Amino acid sequence: ACYCRIPACLAGERRYGTCFYMGRVWAFCC
């Protein structure tokens, strides 16, 4: 599963880009 996170991905996840949600930029993590 993939998630949008602030401020960064959790350990063991990879960042594949960004999400724009509620006026903020989130890390897109899988």
UniProtKB/Swiss-Prot annotation:
Keywords in alphabetical order: Antibiotic, Antimicrobial, Defensin, Disulfide bond, Fungicide, Secreted
InterPro entries the record matches: Alpha-defensin_C, Beta/alpha-defensin_C
One cellular component (GO) term of this entry: extracellular region
Biological process, per Gene Ontology: defense response to bacterium; defense response to fungus; killing of cells of another organism
Keyword Hydrolase: no
A family per Pfam: Defensin_1
Compartments, record wording: Secreted
Keyword Phosphoprotein: no
TM region positions: none
PROSITE patterns for the chain: DEFENSIN
Disulphide bond pairs: C2-C30, C4-C19, C9-C29
Superkingdom of the organism of origin: Eukaryota
Role: Has bacteriostatic activity against L.monocytogenes, E.coli and S.aureus, microbicidial activity against L.monocytogenes and S.aureus and antifungal activity against C.neoformans.
Family statement drawn from the similarity comment of this UniProt entry: Belongs to the alpha-defensin family.
Protein name as annotated: Neutrophil defensin 2
Species of origin: Macaca mulatta
